[in-house]
Amino acid sequence: MMNRIHAVILDWAGTTVDFGSFAPTQIFVEAFRQAFDVEITLAEARVPMGLGKWQHIEALGKLPAVDARWQAKFSRSMSAADIDAIYAAFMPLQIAKVVDFSSPIAGVIDTIAALRAEGIKIGSCSGYPRAVMERLVPAAAGHGYCPDHWVATDDLAAGGRPGPWMALQNVIALGIDAVAHCVKVDDAAPGISEGLNAGMWTVGLAVSGNEFGATWDAYQTMSKEDVAVRREHAASKLYAAGAHYVVDSLADLPEVIAHINARLAQGERL
């Protein structure tokens, strides 16, 4: 039984909770407005998703359209002090709101139970800092989702995504003896890069998360054509990031793991 998957490391928003990853995107828009009266769109707020939140704000400031707006208002580009100010506005807003987005995505609870029945451990990590995770984790547990371990983006001196460190910290905490027997699951490109950099199998989620960018209710009423277009857009970004597999949501993960286990049993290696 050595040649099989022993652990999955799951992202949070858009992967296990918060269908469409709306908690952080809305708060970025509000933080820019509150700190500097600068408008950004939800679509712009989604572009760097998966990074740590300070790095996310930094990346937003470098988007050509956002930089142009900033230059028009302040006659200069965004500085580190500006990023600090937006982050300072972001944090209390996110801490206050994250519990409203803590319900598990459809299929998550059953999938976790199925994985655990196979002896697979459940790790997790997030682009959220610890202060946010300390609110989100117990709220999600109240809804029935409780991974075996979690790591926040500001926990490790080495940093967060797209580096491998949060994923590897899960490997250490869970006592997994081979990174190639782990699967990193994420709905955004930096999380796929994280898994690849850690030497893991990677699975992208094309519908439940940031790249698809729809609420659960909107998804339920969406035409098949619209779903197909959005799915293809999201899948192409995740495959471009290097994902080994792309599926709709975490509910599809057990089938993927069965496929990976078959490949491992035949001697295939990453």
Swiss-Prot record:
EC nos: 3.11.1.1
First-tier enzyme category under EC: hydrolase
Record: residues binding Mg(2+): 11, 13, 187
Keywords: Hydrolase, Magnesium, Metal-binding, Schiff base
Reactions this protein catalyses: phosphonoacetaldehyde + H2O = acetaldehyde + phosphate + H(+)
One Gene Ontology MF term: phosphonoacetaldehyde hydrolase activity
GO biological process: DNA repair; organic phosphonate catabolic process
Transmembrane segments: none
Pfam families: Hydrolase
Required cofactor names: Mg(2+)
Cofactor binding summary note: Binds 1 Mg(2+) ion per subunit.
GO cellular component: cytosol
Record: active site: 11 (nucleophile), 53 (schiff-base intermediate with substrate)
Oligomer status and interactors: Homodimer.
Function statement: Involved in phosphonate degradation.
Similarity field: Belongs to the HAD-like hydrolase superfamily. PhnX family.
Protein name: Phosphonoacetaldehyde hydrolase
Native source species: Salmonella choleraesuis (strain SC-B67)
